[in-house]
Each structure stands twice: as structure tokens, then as C-alpha cells.
């Protein structure tokens, strides 16, 4: 522990130092709190909490010539979910986590197997889990392991939630906002443990690869619209996947989910914006569009908006408008088309690009 504190105060040459975006890799301003000290996977590991601001991990190999590592991550404002676990060790394609004392049940599941039950995960007396698979950092996305945790009833009654490892010290909280219901008001994000939530994440989990190592705190899947496709009338879903970071700015990816014979048929990312309030409580209106080819071979421009959209307009190579939250118009595959929407309470909206 002394070497860990010494390295934090002044990292020596040969110590690998990393910090998630927005995290200061500087010495502590006051004595830190010790969270864990022990040997894990052949390394001596120490975890400190910098009084609600940062988590710092120091690790040095017990044998061999590997260099010590010092990792910094922001945790200011962490709550029951975002402060529930920390990465203690990563070894190849597996990781171990330190569980918070308020976690009563620890399980794992695969987002790409939404119908499979969660499996029990062993936790030792020090609060460290057995090694669990990590999402693959590249290549094929044929599974997406997550932690499914349940907090003690002394904290929040019957509260289960999902966390996933995106490469930072603090795993990322996954949530879900269901689609609009008739005569219902705006809905809030909820835990992604329901059947609709798991089915939505089964088709969008692989898009999380784009968020690795970017200091993400939480990701919400908002099912903001359903659209009946032209010619067949079968329903397609529109989701806004919003990532909030510890340092503040958010990123959104709008995904179009046409009907699929597979529960894990991936959606198509049709819009990607950074440093935006869209799809948050500060940006509750969204419009998106894409090109889609019908089984007949005809190409269409499709557009959909959230519940406050009253009319969608297409201009450019085609000119068309439709009342409500969805539009479909025949158009050549590469025809330039601009999409705008009007809101029920006034004002306009441009599409996520």
C-alpha cells in the first residue's frame, strides 16, 4: 500500500499511467479511503477512493518484469448503481470486480441471449468476484456479457440493474425507456431487466463497442417511435441510444430496427452526434431518418420522431409531408433529402445526422 501511495503521489518512470477522459491524474488533495488491497491474478492490487471524486487503482505484478500500472477514473456523483462495482483486474478476455457492500445478489447474463436466465456469480469474502467474460474489444460481436446485480433491500427494495465493462475502472449502467403509450406522458429511463428492455438491448448491444474507453457513466436505450413499413405494414422500431459521460457531455446514436427473424438482428446506426443534449431530459424531442429497401426492390426514405412531433417534412429530391410521428416516401436510393419536423407546442426539429 505504501508503494501505491508513493506512485500516486509521484509516479516513477516505468509506471504505466492511464486516466479516463476528464479525470485528473494528480496526487490526492486529502488522505484517500482504502477500498481494497490484495493479490488478484498474480498482481498486487490496491484501490483507493479519493473522497467521492476519483477512484485510483495501483497494480504491480508479483513476478516477472511487467511494469506497475496506475489508473484513474472519475466517480463524482456515483449512486447505488454507478457505484456498485469497480474493476479489480483484467486478464485477457476476463475481468474481476469489487462489489459494493450494498449488493445482495451478483449474477451475469449475455445481452445477445435475452431469453437465457442470469447465472450466479461467486463473490469471495473480500467482495471480489470470480473472473467473468468481458465484451470482446474488437472483431466479431457474438456475445455481450453484463453483470446483473441486486441491491440490498435495506437500500432499495427489489432493485435489480445491469452493468457492462467498457474498458474503464467503473462499469457502465444500462437502462431502457419504453416507447410512447396512448394518452401517456413522457416516460423516464428504467432498469434494463424487463423483457422489452432485454429484447431491445439484444439488437443494439454491439453498438456499445463505439463507446469503449470514453469515460461513459450510463447508456440508455430509448424506444422513441414505432413505424409501420410501406407495402407490408410490419412494424419497425426507432431507438435513441444515449451515452452520458462522467465529465458531462453526451453522445447519441439513433438506431433503426426493421423486423428481423433473429432476436439479435443488429439495428442500423442512422445518426451519431456528440456533445449533445438530445434524448435526455434536456432534449426530449428527436427526429431521425434513413433509406430503406422494401422486399419489392423499391427504395424509400423513412423518418420518425418522438411523441411531441406533429408533422414531418421531406424536401430536396422529393417533397412530401405527413401528419404525426412517421413518414415514408418513395425516393431514389442516393437522392438528397432533408428532413424537418414540427412540434405540437410550436418550434421545429432537424434530424440527427
Per-range role (PLM):
Residues 1-353:
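Short, surface-exposed polybasic-aromatic patches that bind anionic ligands, especially phosphate groups
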Amino acid at each position: 500500500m505504501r508503494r501505491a501511495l508513493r506512485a500516486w503521489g509521484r509516479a516513477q518512470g516505468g509506471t504505466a499511467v492511464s486516466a479516463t477522459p476528464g479525470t485528473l491524474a494528480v496526487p490526492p488533495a486529502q488522505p484517500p479511503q482504502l477500498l481494497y488491497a490484495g493479490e488478484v491474478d498474480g498482481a498486487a492490487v490496491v484501490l483507493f477512493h479519493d473522497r467521492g471524486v476519483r477512484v485510483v487503482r495501483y497494480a504491480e505484478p508479483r513476478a516477472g518484469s511487467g511494469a506497475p500500472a496506475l489508473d484513474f477514473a472519475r466517480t463524482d456523483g456515483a449512486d447505488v448503481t454507478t457505484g456498485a462495482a469497480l474493476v479489480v483486474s483484467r486478464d485477457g478476455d476476463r475481468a474481476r470486480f469489487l462489489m459494493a457492500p450494498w449488493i445482495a445478489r451478483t449474477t451475469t447474463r449475455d445481452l445477445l441471449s435475452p431469453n437465457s436466465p442470469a447465472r450466479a456469480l461467486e463473490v469471495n469474502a473480500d467482495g471480489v468476484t470470480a473472473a467473468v467474460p468481458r465484451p470482446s474489444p474488437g472483431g466479431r460481436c457474438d456475445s455481450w456479457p453484463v453483470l446483473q446485480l441486486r441491491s440490498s433491500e435495506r437500500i432499495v427494495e427489489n432493485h435489480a440493474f445491469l452493468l457492462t465493462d467498457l474498458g474503464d475502472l467503473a462499469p457502465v449502467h444500462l437502462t431502457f425507456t419504453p416507447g410512447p403509450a396512448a394518452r401517456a406522458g413522457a416516460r423516464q429511463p428504467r432498469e434494463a431487466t424487463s423483457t422489452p428492455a432485454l429484447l431491445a438491448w439484444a439488437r443494439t448491444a454491439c453498438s456499445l463497442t463505439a463507446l469503449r474507453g470514453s469515460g461513459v457513466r450510463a447508456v440508455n436505450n430509448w424506444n422513441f417511435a414505432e413505424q409501420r413499413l410501406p407495402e407490408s405494414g410490419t412494424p419497425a422500431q426507432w431507438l435513441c441510444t444515449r451515452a452520458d459521460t462522467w465529465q458531462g457531455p453526451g453522445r447519441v446514436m439513433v438506431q433503426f430496427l426493421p423486423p428481423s427473424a433473429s432476436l439479435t438482428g443488429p439495428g442500423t446506426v442512422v445518426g451519431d452526434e456528440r456533445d449533445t443534449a438530445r434524448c435526455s431530459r434536456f432534449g426530449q424531442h428527436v427526429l431521425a431518418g434513413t433509406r430503406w429497401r422494401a422486399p419489392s426492390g423499391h427504395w424509400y426514405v423513412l423518418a420518425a420522431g418522438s411523441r411531441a412531433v406533429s408533422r414531418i417534412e421531406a424536401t430536396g429530391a422529393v417533397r412530401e409531408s405527413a401528419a404525426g410521428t412517421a413518414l415514408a416516401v418513395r425516393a431514389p436510393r442516393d437522392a438528397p433529402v432533408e428532413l424537418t419536423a414540427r412540434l405540437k407546442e410550436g418550434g421545429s426539429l432537424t434530424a440527427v445526422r
